[in-house]
From Swiss-Prot:
GO terms for molecular function: DNA binding; DNA strand exchange activity. It comes from Acanthamoeba polyphaga mimivirus (APMV). This is Putative resolvase R771. InterPro entries: DNA-bd_dom_put_sf (IPR009061), MerR-type_HTH_dom (IPR000551), Recombinase/Transposase-rel (IPR051491), Recombinase_CS (IPR006118), Resolv_N (IPR006119), Resolvase-like_N_sf (IPR036162), Transpos_IS607 (IPR048046). Keywords: Coiled coil, DNA integration, DNA recombination, DNA-binding.
């Protein structure tokens, strides 16, 4: 939206002095055109649209997501939080204590809701599996599509072959089912 105005009107709309508009023009912060008589006309519409877009970007969240599988790993959770706060001091920390296979986690659901609302700038995780054992690419796609955001993985596993990755995923699934079976056994014996 281009709406050019003279200096007096533009300064009134933007709430700045005409001299400030002149400085902004010199710095290239606001578009201007010159009339044949040499008078400056300021593109206030584009300037306001750009500022509005910048303010929308300022309302997006940068998030560090940390997760452990059980309450027995709270020390590891605290280490993850400490590491993330040190490396990303301006990010919001969201944490979960739940299995990586469980997609119904309070913290993960909060991230997905924020992404759908368009409020996620980036999500930082230590490893991909901290966010999700399965469905990582789906969560990544949601964040990219709805928030124009990204996921940053701090520690990537080096050059892992697809077969190794598949084997690791299968072991994770088996561990979950074994733990669940053992948990059920424990309660059936009581």
């Amino acid at each position: 939206m281009s709406k050019y105005m003279g200096g007096k009107e533009a300064s009134s709309v933007l709430g700045v002095h005409q001299r400030t508009l002149y400085q902004w023009d010199k710095k290239g912060w606001i578009k201007t055109i010159r009339t044949k008589g040499g008078k400056r006309l300021y593109d206030v519409g584009s300037y306001l649209a750009d500022k509005d877009e910048e303010s929308k970007e300022d309302h997006k969240l940068s998030i560090c997501y940390v997760r452990v599988s059980s309450n027995n790993q709270k020390d590891d959770l605290e280490r993850q939080i400490k590491f993330m706060k040190k490396k990303y001091p301006n990010h919001t920390i969201i944490k979960d204590i739940s299995s990586g296979i469980n997609m119904n986690r309070k913290g993960l659901n909060k991230i997905i809701d924020l992404a759908i609302e368009g409020r996620v700038k980036e999500v930082v995780v230590a490893y991909k599996d901290r966010l999700a054992r399965f469905g990582f690419s789906l969560i990544e796609r949601l964040i990219e599509k709805y928030s124009d955001g990204k996921i940053v993985v701090v520690r990537k596993k080096e050059n892992q072959e697809p077969q190794e990755e598949l084997m690791e995923d299968m072991m994770d699934v088996m561990n979950v089912f074994i733990a669940r079976r053992n948990g059920l056994k424990k309660y059936s014996n009581k």
